[in-house]
């Protein structure tokens, strides 16, 4: 049974939203992924949000570009946590999406990550689930420890060989 619902306004958002799916897979978290357009399929959006909990969904990640109404509209229908992913557009580089998602009225919160950063949305969803599921919390902690080790190893390497050699080795 999926614990996370990943939805997007268009299939053009999939290259961004797959990052959330990939990180959830890394944590071993079940998810469903589909297209739900707030503007083109409003009835589908309403039914998706209304019935998500019955399907076992505990967190929804919603990505959208442009007017980006999907995350906010879904949050207005469900009491489940909604994480909004602003998708970069060719017009305003995703700023329109970011502002649309982040500027929600009081009482209808949407947690918002950086433009095109569905990976962080997946990590945030895992952190939320980790409150209830100790195994997921353990995996999130291990992930963050691994990131810490990687940074410390890179810092040590840079300090040992200097920036010129470090950059040469990265090329």
Curated annotation (Swiss-Prot):
It catalyses: 5-carboxyamino-1-(5-phospho-D-ribosyl)imidazole + H(+) = 5-amino-1-(5-phospho-D-ribosyl)imidazole-4-carboxylate. Its EC number is 5.4.99.18. The keyword Isomerase applies. GO terms for biological process: 'de novo' IMP biosynthetic process. One of its GO terms (molecular function) is 5-(carboxyamino)imidazole ribonucleotide mutase activity. The keyword Isomerase applies. Disulfide bonds: none annotated. Keywords: Isomerase, Purine biosynthesis. It is an enzyme of class 5 (isomerase). InterPro entries: PurE_ClassI, PurE_dom, PurE_prokaryotes. Substrate binds at residues 10, 13, 40. SMART domains: AIRC. Pathway: Purine metabolism; IMP biosynthesis via de novo pathway; 5-amino-1-(5-phospho-D-ribosyl)imidazole-4-carboxylate from 5-amino-1-(5-phospho-D-ribosyl)imidazole (N5-CAIR route): step 2/2. It holds the Pfam family AIRC. Catalyzes the conversion of N5-carboxyaminoimidazole ribonucleotide (N5-CAIR) to 4-carboxy-5-aminoimidazole ribonucleotide (CAIR). Belongs to the AIR carboxylase family. Class I subfamily. This is N5-carboxyaminoimidazole ribonucleotide mutase.
């Amino acid at each position: 049974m999926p614990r996370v619902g990943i939805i997007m306004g268009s299939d053009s958002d999939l290259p961004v939203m797959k990052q959330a799916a990939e990180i959830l897979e890394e944590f071993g978290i079940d998810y469903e992924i589909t297209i739900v357009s707030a503007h083109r399929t409003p009835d589908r959006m309403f039914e998706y949000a209304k019935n998500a909990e019955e399907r076992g969904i505990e967190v929804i990640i919603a990505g959208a570009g442009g007017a980006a109404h999907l995350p906010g509209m879904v949050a207005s229908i469900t009491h489940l946590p909604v994480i909004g992913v602003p998708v970069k557009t060719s017009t305003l580089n995703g700023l329109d999406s970011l502002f649309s998602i982040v500027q929600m009225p009081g009482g209808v919160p949407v947690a918002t990550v950086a433009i095109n950063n569905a990976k962080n949305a997946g990590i945030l969803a895992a952190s939320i689930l980790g409150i209830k599921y100790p195994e997921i919390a353990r995996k999130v902690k291990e992930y963050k420890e691994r990131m810490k080790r990687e940074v410390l190893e890179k810092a040590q390497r840079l300090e040992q060989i200097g920036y010129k050699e470090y950059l040469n080795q990265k090329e």
